[in-house]
């Protein structure tokens, strides 16, 4: 069941005009440090803080909705929530179905991780999360693609030997490698994929998209977006 979580920004705004717009923000809740569920059962992470701040700046009441990754776009277009903020890379294929804001996380490379540095990433089995740009890339390389529903399952597949390596965003993998005590290592060269990470909206919601786009522009301009990036991505820092 999808989980609705009233944000702090929403609570602060409930005393406002009754006409204030309530916006439902859809995320996966399983892709740290972008988004995850904390010990209190609440959405947390970089995108939680970013989304709350964007809602505050736009004067919007916002709720958080968690949704499995492989249906996150269909459930946006069907109206289950109003925006996606879930570590989603901007791609031409996705842009044919939904509209993206500008990126709030700059284009960065994906990476392979395995149990040894010479893991076979061209002829072996490579794990990737289903419906991701990484899965599409693996399918195009000649390696055997093993798709999993969640990011954690892709890591588990490498640890238990089901896959020779995993391909995912480097910033997701970096803390996992650092905390593995040498069990996991980066393999080969980084792989540039996607056009950065942006928020996704229904194509009919152009005015709503613009409110968030304006907020992202303002946060880039005043340095607050860079401050959030520095806070949450300590293993692979990026900035605008």
Language-model segments: residues:
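Gram-negative bacterial Sec-dependent N-terminal signal peptides
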Residues: 1-20
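Ligand-binding clefts/hinges and TM-proximal coupling segments of bilobed small-molecule sensing domains
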Residues: 61, 137-153, 186, 216-240
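Short helix-initiation/N-cap motifs at beta->coil->alpha
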Residues: 48, 64-74, 130-131, 146-160, ...
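A conserved helix-loop-strand patch within extracytoplasmic ligand-binding domains
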Residues: 60, 89, 94-96, 100-146
């Amino acid at each position: 069941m999808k989980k609705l979580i009233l944000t702090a920004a929403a609570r602060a705004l409930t005393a406002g005009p009754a006409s204030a717009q309530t916006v439902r923000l859809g995320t996966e809740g399983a892709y740290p440090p972008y988004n995850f569920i904390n010990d209190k059962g609440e959405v947390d992470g970089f995108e939680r803080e970013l989304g709350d701040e964007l809602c505050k700046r736009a004067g919007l009441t916002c709720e958080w909705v968690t949704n499995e990754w492989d249906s996150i776009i269909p459930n946006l277009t069907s109206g289950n929530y109003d925006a996606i903020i879930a570590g989603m890379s901007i791609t031409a294929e996705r842009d044919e179905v939904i509209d993206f804001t500008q990126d709030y996380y700059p284009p960065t490379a994906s990476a392979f991780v395995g149990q040894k540095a010479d893991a076979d990433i061209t002829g072996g089995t490579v794990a990737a999360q289903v419906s991701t740009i990484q899965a599409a890339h693996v399918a195009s390389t000649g390696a055997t693609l093993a798709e999993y529903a969640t990011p954690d399952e892709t890591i588990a597949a490498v640890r238990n030997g089901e896959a020779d390596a995993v391909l995912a965003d480097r910033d997701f993998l970096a803390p996992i490698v650092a905390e593995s005590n040498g069990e996991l290592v980066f393999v080969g060269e980084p792989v540039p994929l996607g056009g950065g990470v942006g928020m996704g909206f229904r194509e009919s919601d152009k005015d709503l998209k613009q409110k968030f786009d304006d907020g992202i522009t303002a946060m880039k301009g005043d340095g607050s977006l860079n401050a959030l990036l520095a806070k949450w991505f300590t293993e692979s820092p990026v900035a605008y």
